[in-house]
Amino acid sequence: MTLAEYEWMRNQLDEPIKLKKKRLMLDRVQEDSFDPYKEISNNRRHFKKTEDLYYLVLNLHMVEKTEVSETEFEFLRYECRIIEEYLMQIPDYGQFELSILADFPWIFSDRFIENNYLKIKKRMRRLAQLNNHEQYLFTFLINLTSFYIENGRLKKARSVNEDMKRSLAHKERSTVIYETLMADYYQRLISAALGEEKTKDYQEFFTVLEYMLGKNQRRSLEKKLLAIAEPSN
């Protein structure tokens, strides 16, 4: 048994308990009596007591769920710093670490992403080979692309988007329909933001997207593209 195989089986035992705790916390986020700052404080206290990074990751999930403002997000710089320092110290990434990178690439410094980009992709591919978890690499790339777009860093967004499309190119197209659609969508979004193409040229694409993903998903994605492209049109 390899270390990676042992790690995967161990995670199958530990993860359900943690997933349940996360689900219960995210359910409580919707309650009027929920106090996010108290929850953050409690989770930090648990982290200092157990040294389990999971409690800091809970805070990231909670903040993402509540859609706090950028000012409020500054309150979580502690979590971002501790998590990045932890990932810089360990020699390899397991499933837990890769899930953090996939879900929250935007919490890391540019230097960390640039220095570890190839390592992250390589480890995610290894994980996919071990237990067919293909979604880690795609989620990481699409979230990183989205983050760069939202911050106006379109050259970086295009570079990651092209990387995403290359990673899908060798796969059977029928097995990655959603992934291919989203990679194409972000390619078009970047082009629109750069003023390279007009949004009216995308109607055929959105018709296909609606057919595959439904009207609600089409409306949401089309609205996002129009909002980003509007200043350049």
Residue ranges and their predicted role:
Residues 49-56, 91-96, 135, 175-178:
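Residue signature of alpha-solenoid helical repeat architecture, marking inter-repeat boundaries
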Residues 41-45, 81-88, 121-128, 162-173, ...:
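Amphipathic alpha-helical segments of tetratricopeptide repeats
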Residues 104, 141, 148, 191-193:
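Residue at a conserved register position within TPR or TPR-like alpha-solenoid repeats
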Residues 28-42, 70-81, 110-122, 154-164, ...:
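Helix-turn-helix repeat elements of alpha-solenoid scaffolds
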Residues 1-20:
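Basic, Lys/Arg-rich alpha-helical nucleic-acid-recognition elements, primarily the DNA-binding modules
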Residues 15-70, 79-80:
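Helix-turn-helix/homeodomain-like alpha-helical modules used for DNA recognition
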Residues 189-233:
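C-terminal non-catalytic interaction modules
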